[in-house]
């Protein structure tokens, strides 16, 4: 009887040790490796981002391109042309073009075209007329100076204009910006209230304005000189801008 009890206790001890070992295992409560791998692939944000962003990258130009219009009237971003420089400057030359993916256009007869011929003048983008591109403005340069100063502007060709080379280019332009000062207002203030320095204060030249104010316009001499200088445009705004 005692041996039977000892055998039962031994079996219970072995069973309890097995249960404790299983419960303390690091794999309890976790998915099998293949299930965990499948979950990580299905819920990966990288995979979803790539698949959802790819059509946006390829179709971002489609909204700018009219559908069903003439192929020859499409903007430059909507077509792909086999451009080359083997042409005479200023003369028209024919180039073979095709609409980009997702863009549909027709010929003059209303038939859909995959390839068409586009006639362009042989000239680079930086050789276009100033009305055919837009350039950045600069308010950091003096417009009233001798010789006239220039600044480096970034220019971009208009959408409907076709040309050779890069559509974004750098160009040296004259400083030509205004701060809102009117020449007529400055001249009127110089004639009427120039003795109190009102013209100089209006142009932002407060030091000269204080000098005229406390000297009563230089006893009239400074006032007459300022009328002449403002009248011919020699004296301008203190920020270096042009008159309106």
From Swiss-Prot:
| Spans within the Extracellular topological domain | 22-176, 234-244
Keyword field contains Transmembrane helix: yes
Task: Write out the transmembrane intervals.
Answer: 177-197, 213-233
The answer to whether keyword Chloroplast applies is no
Glycosylation site residues: 86, 94, 115, 137, 152, 176
Keyword set for this entry?
Answer: Glycoprotein, Membrane, Signal, Transmembrane, Transmembrane helix
Q: Specify the signal sequence span.
A: 1-21
- On the tree of life, the source organism's domain of life is Eukaryota
Q: Which InterPro entries match?
A: TM2, TM2D1-3-like
Q: Where in the cell is it found?
A: Membrane
Please report the record's description of how this protein sits within the membrane. Multi-pass membrane protein
Q: Name one GO cellular component term.
A: membrane
Q: Which residues lie on this side of the membrane: Cytoplasmic?
A: 198-212
Q: Could you tell me which residue ranges the TM2 domain spans?
A: 180-227
Q: Which PANTHER family match?
A: BETA-AMYLOID BINDING PROTEIN-RELATED, TM2 DOMAIN-CONTAINING PROTEIN 3
Regarding protein family, the annotation reads: Belongs to the TM2 family.
Q: What is this protein called?
A: TM2 domain-containing protein 3
Species assigned in the record: Danio rerio (Zebrafish)
Taxonomy of the source species:
Eukaryota, Metazoa, Chordata, Craniata, Vertebrata
- Gene behind the chain: tm2d3
């Amino acid at each position: 009887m005692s041996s039977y009890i000892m055998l039962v206790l031994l079996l219970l001890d072995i069973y309890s040790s097995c249960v404790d070992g299983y419960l303390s295992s690091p794999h309890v409560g976790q998915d099998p490796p293949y299930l965990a791998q499948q979950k990580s692939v299905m819920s990966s944000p990288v995979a979803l981002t790539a698949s959802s962003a790819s059509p946006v990258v390829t179709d971002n130009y489609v909204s700018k391109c009219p559908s069903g219009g003439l192929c020859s009237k499409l903007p430059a971003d909507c077509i792909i042309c086999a451009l080359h420089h083997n042409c005479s400057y200023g003369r028209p030359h024919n180039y073979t073009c095709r609409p980009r993916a997702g863009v549909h256009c027709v010929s003059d007869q209303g038939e859909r075209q995959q390839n068409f011929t586009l006639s362009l003048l042989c000239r680079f983008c930086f050789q276009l007329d100033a009305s055919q591109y837009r350039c950045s403005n600069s308010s950091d340069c003096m417009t009233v100076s001798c010789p006239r100063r220039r600044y480096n502007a970034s220019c971009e060709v208009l959408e409907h204009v076709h040309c050779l080379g890069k559509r974004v280019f750098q160009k040296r332009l004259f400083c030509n910006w205004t701060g809102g000062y009117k020449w007529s207002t400055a001249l009127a203030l110089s004639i009427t209230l120039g003795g109190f320095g009102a013209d100089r204060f209006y142009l932002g030249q407060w030091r000269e304005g204080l000098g005229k104010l406390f000297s009563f316009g230089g006893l009239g001499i400074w006032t007459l000189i300022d009328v002449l200088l403002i009248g011919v445009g020699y004296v301008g705004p203190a920020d270096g801008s042009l008159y309106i």
